[in-house]
Amino acid sequence: MAPSLWKGLVGIGLFALAHAAFSAAQHYFPSSGIKWKRKCEFLQSSSFQDKIFRSMYYVYDRSYMRLTEKEDESLPIDIVLQTLLAFAVTCYGIVHIAGEFKDMDATSELKNKTFDTLRNHPSFYVYNHRGRVLFRPSDTTNSSNQDALSSNTSLKLRKLESLRR
């Protein structure tokens, strides 16, 4: 099918999800708060005062829900079904928009490689490691340490001579 059809299906699914969210919000906050707006007309329209009004209305609505014993009321089944159906439609459309997935089976890529090159990563080869020192015979170790010390002192002397000039 055409990609625009799947994009349209995703759009319809997202619109249905937004509608379900709006319906759920209306279910939990059913009244418009006109009574409280009339009582609070002395409040001018500023962002801080709007926040105060919303918090007062929320407390009023919660206490009303407690008095009518509707506090633990769940969402109606039509809102729940609309949410689930919209989610399924959106996911179905997204899967078709994504296109064909690549196979996870790597045999096609490994056909032209030999066993020697299969796990061969030359960039991980390390030639300068402690194995040279650890597995060297002990008599050569002492002489090499003395050679290293003498070369270090001669190097230091050369540096000092260049500084004196």
UniProtKB/Swiss-Prot annotation:
InterPro entries given in the database record: MMgT (IPR018937)
Membrane topology according to the record: Multi-pass membrane protein
Record topological domains on the Cytoplasmic side: 1-3, 98-165
Bilayer-spanning residue ranges: 4-22, 78-97
Record GO terms (molecular function): inorganic cation transmembrane transporter activity
Superkingdom of origin organism: Eukaryota
Pfam families attached to this UniProt entry: MMgT
Functional description taken from the UniProt entry: Part of the endoplasmic reticulum membrane protein complex (EMC) that enables the energy-independent insertion into endoplasmic reticulum membranes of newly synthesized membrane proteins. Preferentially accommodates proteins with transmembrane domains that are weakly hydrophobic or contain destabilizing features such as charged and aromatic residues. Involved in the cotranslational insertion of multi-pass membrane proteins in which stop-transfer membrane-anchor sequences become ER membrane spanning helices.
Matches recorded under PANTHER family: ER MEMBRANE PROTEIN COMPLEX SUBUNIT 5, PTHR21181
Family designation: Belongs to the membrane magnesium transporter (TC 1.A.67) family.
Protein name: ER membrane protein complex subunit 5
Encoding gene (name): MMGT1
